[in-house]
Amino acid sequence: MKDITAIISTKDRYTNLALVVSSIINQTVIPNELIIFDDGEQKDLRQDPVWDNLFKVLYEKNIDFKIIFGEKKGQVLNHDKSLQIAKNELIWRIDDDNLLLHNTLENLLKYFDDKTGAIGGEIRLPITNFKPEECSSKIEDIYQKPNRQWAKIEHIEYVDHLHNSFLFRKSAAKWGAPTYLSSVGHREETLFTYQMKLDGWDIKLVPNALIWHLKNATGGIRSYNNEEMYKEDEWKFNRMINIWKLQYEQKSVLIPLDNGLGDHWAFKNIIPLLKEKYKFVTIAACFPEVFKDDNVELISIAEAKDILPNFNNLNIYAWMEKNNWKQHIIEAYKTLWL
């Protein structure tokens, strides 16, 4: 047993979910915590004989487990909550239509070192045959090639992003889950892991960590039939990729300060450090006069809201609350932006 939290967000897939949980129980290395977010019918599964027995096995295996009735707002919100609820630094994100090979977690851990932000293996649909050379998990190939996880993996590969299921380090997820997406959460895993990569963490694919994707036409995100949600998420995805290109490649950052006067003065303390890291610093300020002598570009909060899909995720007080922050706000600003 390892200090790992397995997280599953589910919606109306209780049969599939039982397969996932049974395959977690039968891992050669077992996580010591399992959290399931139920966004569906929210049944009392203790009344189901299959589930009643699964719960007994979880008890026998000493796996600390809980089922949390979600807000029915989609898996991204549930995954974001898991960052606050999970008791462990390592979190195993698993989809509710997965079937895990018995040694999947053991082999993920084998390659998980201090530089690793997230690590995944093959995510295979039954009776599919993608060729490795035709696949890619590079951001620039996302519209041209199948995902690299859909084909055989025979050695460690360093990639830009992961999808579906992966093991990750909680401290590498300082920005949280992309809760600016719709309930569908289209591109969630890509945005989540690619930002880790941009922050300097290794994102890896490794061999012998197979997960079968028992893709289901109903339940889960396929409960949402609103095509506009997918279009909106795709637009936000492309907007974030362009923002990150500016921030990480051209060293140009936009920071919204939608808070009080004192918070602006606190933020002012880190401007010299920001200028060391970035060539161009733009601040969306409620009190722009605080920065009149700092030689930074200033824009309005309204402009920042139009530019940043993740505007609300960057609120310093929301971030401190999520991260149970106990230090000074200046240190919070440093942690978030430096």
What are these regions (language model features)?
Residues 13-26:
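Short, well-formed alpha-helical segments that are part of the catalytic scaffolds
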Residues 25-68:
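Acidic donor-binding segment of Leloir-type glycosyltransferases
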Residues 70-86:
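Glycine-rich, basic loop-to-helix element that forms the pyrophosphate-binding segment
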Residues 76, 148-168:
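A recurrent flexible, glycine/aromatic-enriched loop bordering the glycosyltransferase active site
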Residues 105-136:
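Conserved donor NDP-sugar-binding/catalytic core segment of glycosyltransferases
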Residues 185-192:
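Acidic donor-binding loop at a coil-to-helix junction in glycosyltransferase catalytic cores
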Residues 248-338:
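Catalytic machinery of carbohydrate-active enzymes
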